């Protein structure tokens, strides 16, 4: 309503908040415009920053208009019926249903890892879906948005066969690189990714095997979810070196040099919490336990290695400010504005 102008740096104080309260409560402002997003990316580029979007192409939410299990769009004007609602839905082929006699409101569809809130997308039976997603891949790395790449959620799970998975990512890479040759394609992946890192699919990966896991065991003796503590792994240089040599050998040099090297992220306990060697999760231990008996000096040592190891050192927001937390959702706490741990 005010023109969609970005906040200036000097407007970050609380006394300016009332000027913008209508922006986030007015119905017309609930969804930012594409034009504002393009402006945001342009400003970030001007400041020497780059923007990578999170692409979740393996599944969608059950509330997505394509499925509409929660029946949000069923009676809204301008929306076609979701695949859950009707067998005649234009999105029916986007999903794999297993009982053809349950419409309307058919709950028998494939969900990612069995989660009915995360319907798995059925590319093999829907050229329309594949074409749409490939257009999306190119759209956001192209003018006027000029995003700098994609982070691909559970990328190896996409499709219902490995053959199709590799075929799709080859098409995805072609679409992205033709639109923006400098855009990076970064995949979330656990295990050996060499089959995708041959120059025709992904550029690199979130580096669990050749960074996060070996460092976590060496510095803390903890599994990355804080689900297990192995004292024999703490400070075990032989295990650390052997693991690094083994997993780094599966990378070609360009992928290794750009791999996303994290100590913490949104799926695992905070590294600082792992330094207390406390096994468990927030629902059993409580959130306060995550910050008990921590060892910041251990994290500082790990950060030195993170910043000097081959790859792209990647900070998870709040790690630099001493944020603690057990695994998801406790690891997604609010940033401690004004209360950062400066040490």
Predicted regions and their residues:
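The substrate-binding groove and active-site-proximal loops of carbohydrate-active enzymes
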Residues: 1-35, 114-130, 153-164, 225-238, ...
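Aromatic- and carboxylate-lined catalytic core of secreted/periplasmic carbohydrate-active enzymes
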Residues: 246, 337-343
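The start of beta-strands in P-loop NTPase/AAA+ ATPase cores
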Residues: 49, 146-148, 183
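A structural signal for well-ordered alpha-helical segments within the folded catalytic domains
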Residues: 35-39, 61, 127, 131-134, ...
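Substrate-binding/active-site clefts of carbohydrate-active enzymes
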Residues: 1-144, 172, 178, 195, ...
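Conserved alpha/beta catalytic core and glycan-binding cleft of carbohydrate-active enzymes
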Residues: 63, 68, 169, 173-174, ...
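Conserved N-terminal glycine/acidic-rich loop preference
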Residues: 118, 136-143, 147-176, 192-213
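Conserved beta-strand positions in the central sheet of alpha/beta enzyme cores
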Residues: 52, 151-153, 186
């Amino acid at each position: 309503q005010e023109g969609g102008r970005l906040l200036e740096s000097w407007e970050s104080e609380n006394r300016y908040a009332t000027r913008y309260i209508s922006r986030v409560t007015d119905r017309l402002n609930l969804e930012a415009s594409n034009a504002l997003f393009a402006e945001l990316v342009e400003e970030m580029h001007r400041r020497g920053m780059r923007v990578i979007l999170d692409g979740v192409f393996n599944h969608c939410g059950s509330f997505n208009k394509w499925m509409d299990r929660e029946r949000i769009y069923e009676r809204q004007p301008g929306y076609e019926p979701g695949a859950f609602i009707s067998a005649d839905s234009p999105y029916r082929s986007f999903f794999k249903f297993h009982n053809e006699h349950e419409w309307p409101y058919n709950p028998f569809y494939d969900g990612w890892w069995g989660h009915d809130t995360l319907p798995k997308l059925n590319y093999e039976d829907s050229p329309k879906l594949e074409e749409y997603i490939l257009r999306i891949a190119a759209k956001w790395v192209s003018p006027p948005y000029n995003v700098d790449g994609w982070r691909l959620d559970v990328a190896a799970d996409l499709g219902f066969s490995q053959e199709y998975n590799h075929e799709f990512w080859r098409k995805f890479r072609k679409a992205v690189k033709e639109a923006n040759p400098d855009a990076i394609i970064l995949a979330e992946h656990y295990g050996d990714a060499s089959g995708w890192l041959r120059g025709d699919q992904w550029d690199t990966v979130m580096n669990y095997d050749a960074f996060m896991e070996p460092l976590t065991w060496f510095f803390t003796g903890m599994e990355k979810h804080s689900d297990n503590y192995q004292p024999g792994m703490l400070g075990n240089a032989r295990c650390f070196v052997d693991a690094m040599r083994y997993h780094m050998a599966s990378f070609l040099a360009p992928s290794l040099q750009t791999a996303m090297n994290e100590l913490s992220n949104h799926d695992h306990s905070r590294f600082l919490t792992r330094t207390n060697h406390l096994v468990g999760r927030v629902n059993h231990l409580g959130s306060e336990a995550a910050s008990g008996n921590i060892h910041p000096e251990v994290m500082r040592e790990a950060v030195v290695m993170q910043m000097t190891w081959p790859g792209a050192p990647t900070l998870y927001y709040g790690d630099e400010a001493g944020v603690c937390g057990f695994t998801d959702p406790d690891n997604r706490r609010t940033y401690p504005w004004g209360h950062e741990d400066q040490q």
